[in-house]
């Protein structure tokens, strides 16, 4: 039965990722459409890259159980201005990294162009998946005596899109309805074209671009819907720009978070009280332990892929958010009570460690903790998680809302 439930969740996740996982604007549209199909009391959508769903509590409305995730993922953005580069070997689009990536891992793989362009006073969306693919080529090792591939610079991240610039521009105008001038301030990116696939003889592992953090976004959305009517108000938030620091208008440093709570209260005083009384899960992935890189992990506090959802009380050199003592233990007891496999995880403080949005909620006075599935090959074009961990994360999120 558990295996069947894992597969059901996996199939839903695969459908979402294959169709909408290429970019956060597609994810926000998907979440909005799902909200329209379900029983939601309030939808707060802001500037195409932020959305929050609210279901009012049956008895308790002066606080909320909140799960927040981000729907952006590392990618290659087409640079603004004039991104076209014409060389003797073809026409290229110049890209810049969005988020932390290892440049070499994004070469010699199939890429698709996604995003949006402002043309003829309207937004035109682009997604070439399933139709047109592109790539960035590497230098053959026979000619790389200077080890240029080892110390790759961002200026080599050029995506070849054709032979002749006029033909390329004619294509964009005839098929997409956009001109060269429209590229100056476009919001376009190249992302891997891979569909979600199963890995291993047991098929327990899931390979996909963008598990960070769309796996957590998916689990929180499903848990929000499946938990039904609850005594306490529940909120699920999907933000963006986490991979670059959450500083933009649709990131978690924005005042937009306060606005969500203001919509649910009568005045600023009660709104601040509601925030301070609320419990928040920062749903973000954690680093999956790998024995071949064991010196980079805290072996006594590492999450192994396939062994359960990761509960992260603190992380990073500066510890980021340090989850309140009582709250972290309440979450642990919730997992035990519901027979949910969990692991305690934290990064090795001498090795750095990533940041999440939890610290921005902590500064507002919320009880907040980081929870997410362990991931292998994080920030690569094809990240890896476990079906069992995805199910455990969903179960814990659902129990959090229900309790």
Placement of each model-derived feature along the sequence:
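N-terminal hydrophobic/helix-forming segments and targeting peptides
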Residues: 1-403
